[in-house]
Amino acid sequence: RDVAPSRGLGDVYKRQKIEDPFWGHMQELVTDVVIPFQEDVLNDRQPGVEKSHAIENFKIAAGLSQGEFYGMVFQDSDVAKWLEGVAYSLIIKPDAALEKRADDIIDIIAAAQQPDGYLNTYFTIKEPEHRWQNLLECHELYCAGHMMEAAVAYYEATGKDKLLKVMEGMAGHIIDRFGPDKLPGIPGHQEVEIGLMRMYHATGNE
């Protein structure tokens, strides 16, 4: 059933301002240094840092690039956490260029989503026949939860719901496959729970 969505964290952040010099400086470091650095890492543009391939994995899964999956099974979560960080950064320090780059990455993520709603670059590229077969170790629900959190944060920060719609599709895919008389099992790493909760708070859809 549908219920009225509750106030999200974006509203809380918009009403608050850090004035303490120490924590204010930490906040500036995140917006001005950490987020740009991590963006370069995710795009394999940072010299002297181990290749991430995280954005490239999404491009390959979307059919926008050729190649093999590289990284850990949970590599997608790095992109999700960067997008969530960008969302909170945009609330306190609007940046049209950064927002446009985030929008472009969201377009790639949306293109990587499979027709049945599934979203995970490792299994889409490397082992499509083994989806949902190793919940304890393969982090599919973990990655989904982080991307759900990113989708909600970005929606609350910008009003743009493209990633939110993508993750509603993934949530529907999960619901179709788990539950009574469906796939049994529990995730090996908590995260999808808070992702689903935040999706509910943002959309009101159970």
Residue ranges and their predicted role:
Residues 1-9, 13:
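Single conserved hydrophobic/aromatic residue that forms the stacking wall/gate
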